[in-house]
Amino acid sequence: MIRIGVLGPVGSGKTTLIEFLTEYLVKKEGLSVGIITNDVISSHDALRIYQNLVLKEKLLPKENVIGIVTGGCPHTAIREDPSVNLRALETLMKRTSLDVIFIESGGDNVMSTFSPILADYTIFVLDTAAGDKYPGKGGLGIQESDLLVVNKIDLAPFVGADLEKMRRDAEKIRKDKPTVFISLKTGDGIDDLIKIIRSELELEGLIRS
């Protein structure tokens, strides 16, 4: 079983990414998936996932989704004091046998990271609508995440974001750690994303090459 932490600023596409990867892992790889969401003041993301993946697509049983309302700084619940998320993990694992558990952080800044006792693998999500400056600015989330996902590349021409600049800056900041440029709306770059995720799952012994 692998715990995948997904974090990034508000509106970058974290929930959409989790929904996409869950559909892929369940339908294409035959894996069992659980999801924990963190929101500051509501369970909006958990409700959305429940409506889309449980009710509409029928990909997950309802007991595989847990929503947490943190009521404070989003990073506290995933880093400084992850106890509420650890309890949610324990609850999920008692309910059913799972291969992958996604833990979605509440929207936060580029300094956010997951505690290593909470997540085995981390994905930081940026989007081009926020501009092309973020990879170059660094921050622990961008630097230390196992995978950096730059989402909404279809919007780059409309917001003046230079994708090549973002690519160069990411390579400089992240060294040999992977970065993928995707659009979850158009499907651009999705093959690269899946290749990286599959590679990690192969290392964990969850799927075969």
From Swiss-Prot:
Homodimer. UreD, UreF and UreG form a complex that acts as a GTP-hydrolysis-dependent molecular chaperone, activating the urease apoprotein by helping to assemble the nickel containing metallocenter of UreC. The UreE protein probably delivers the nickel. GO terms for biological process: urea catabolic process. SUPFAM superfamilies: P-loop containing nucleoside triphosphate hydrolases. PANTHER family: UREASE ACCESSORY PROTEIN G. One of its GO terms (cellular component) is cytoplasm. The keyword Chaperone applies. GTP binds at residues 8-15. Keywords: Chaperone, Cytoplasm, GTP-binding, Nickel insertion, Nucleotide-binding. It comes from Sulfurisphaera tokodaii (strain DSM 16993 / JCM 10545 / NBRC 100140 / 7) (Sulfolobus tokodaii). InterPro entries: CobW/HypB/UreG_nucleotide-bd, P-loop_NTPase, UreG. This is Urease accessory protein UreG. It is found in: Cytoplasm. GO terms for molecular function: GTP binding; GTPase activity; nickel cation binding. Facilitates the functional incorporation of the urease nickel metallocenter. This process requires GTP hydrolysis, probably effectuated by UreG. The keyword Manganese does not apply. NCBIfam families: ureG (TIGR00101). The gene is ureG. Belongs to the SIMIBI class G3E GTPase family. UreG subfamily. It comes from the Archaea. HAMAP family: UreG (MF_01389).
